[in-house]
């Protein structure tokens, strides 16, 4: 959501509570990003909720997940869609790029998120993509199923728009719930994409938590890290080291 030069850089599950206190960072003279106060956020409750809600997406056919993602991608490529307008408006100040560059990046990224592209991806990766949904016979004596982690924690840093959405999509294809911190320069697309997915299907409003926090000042506690299945990190060596340590 954006109003008067302020972008709310968070999308939390329906049942979670957003702290009343919000932090804000100015990314330009007339634009700021607002996000939940990290210390006030009940992270244990949020992680517990995402884990519990994972059953909803685990029962969703991967073809339906791909279709929903594809529809959002189409919206981002539709020059008359308000979602595209908002994405471009927020990308410019947050990533520090020109309007022309924002359009070029959005067009290139969105083309990789279409239903056709993602269907081809899973067909390349898996001989039978249905292994993402259930056990499939691979020979006369064996069956196989691909089972993603219950909760995926993705931590990003930097200013490359779209990286977070690609990571989010790959986790969704494995039917993981996702807790994501995008980099400040990449807050626009992951947050807006998560919101748009929630409009496509309520399942995504249960299993996605995408919000910014200042990774240099606030670190995820070890007890929280121990509850997630996998941690995916993008950024500098120092950024990744801060998570490991």
Regions found by a protein language model. Give the residues of each.
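Alpha-helical scaffold segments in soluble metabolic enzymes
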Residues: 71, 192, 196, 242
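Conserved NAD(P)+-binding/catalytic subdomain of aldehyde/semialdehyde dehydrogenases
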Residues: 201-245
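Residue-level signal for inorganic ion chemistry
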Residues: 65, 175, 231
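Conserved small-residue-rich beta-alpha loop and adjacent elements
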Residues: 118-200
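N-terminal Rossmann-like NAD(P)+-binding subdomain of aldehyde/semialdehyde dehydrogenases
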Residues: 1-144
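Conserved active-site and cofactor/substrate-binding residues in soluble primary-metabolism enzymes
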Residues: 60, 64, 188, 238
